[in-house]
Amino acid sequence: GGTWEGWWEFPGGKIEHGENVFQALNRELIEELDINVNPIKIEEKVNFDYGNRKIELTIINCGIISGVQITLIEHEEMRWLSQEELLDVNWLPADRPILEKWFNRGLPNLPLD
């Protein structure tokens, strides 16, 4: 654990050299949750300054291709949340503005397939 132990975050991670955001998302979700996804579109981009480092968070709407049974590889817990439940967990500061927007305005349209 570290400074943010016990906080919630979107699954994902850093883009490696030679990857685009969609390739990075696929790799990270296989590494973290053992699922393959079909990235549909970028929903949001947020820049956040944690003081000691700056990050760009890219939220991508996607459908699950395989691995419907999610395996927690790098995380302790996972939850599906309804719009009403979005703010019920302790989100990392970079993620919170996106969740507050979805809580107030509604979730992005999810892909049907």
PLM segments and residue spans:
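Surface-exposed, flexible loop/turn segments at secondary-structure boundaries
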Residues: 1, 48, 86
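Conserved Nudix-box catalytic region and its N-terminal flanking loop in Nudix hydrolases
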Residues: 1-31
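A general structural signal for well-ordered alpha-helical segments in protein cores
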Residues: 22, 56-57, 95, 99
